[in-house]
Amino acid sequence: MPGAVHSGFEAWRGMIPADALPPGFDLENTQLIWGRGAHAVLYPVRKGRYLNAVICARSRDRSLRLPRKGDAGVLLDSLRGWHPSLRQLFELVREWPVWPLLEMPRKGPWHHGRMALIGDAAHGMLPFAAQGAAMGIEDAEVLAAMVERHGTSEAALAAWGALRRKRVRKVVALARQNGRIYHMGWPFSMARNLVLGLTSPGNLAERQAWIYDWKP
């Protein structure tokens, strides 16, 4: 089966203790921040004891090693146009491991005989729709149903793949589209921000409602 390929993006990931955060910092919600050259996602982990900071940007290093040690100075220099409050927040991170963002080839097989790959192993995707783990859970649900119907045979795996491919491809396409939107350069980013400012939260949620409406 074909291996993973580099998507051209990388993710810098760092943890900040909650007690080091500025007073009043929102530790209840996930925050998505668009900036020049990158985007950031902030969300609480470990029952709110830490803030996980993830900064995604285009990568010059196309190696597949997992992960490499990031240079905080290089990262902060790349974010020099960002708001000072965000740069100060990122300065609280002690270590920045850098992960290459990988994808699996679209046309690769998901099973061979009675052996199968599911989740990221079969269809690793960009994290820009936050659906990689969810697709793995759905895979398991559908695979269990096909094994119940066909037994532990190759037919079960063939049926599972036929049922899953169309939906997974649609989610992969959405993640890639989000990546293009998140990393738009000037002046397209100005138009993006204008449209976003005129869009209600309900309409934004509706854009991905088809994902959450899925039934096995």
Question: What are the residue ranges of the model-derived segments?
Answer:
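C-terminal auxiliary extensions adjacent to catalytic cores
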Residues: 196-216
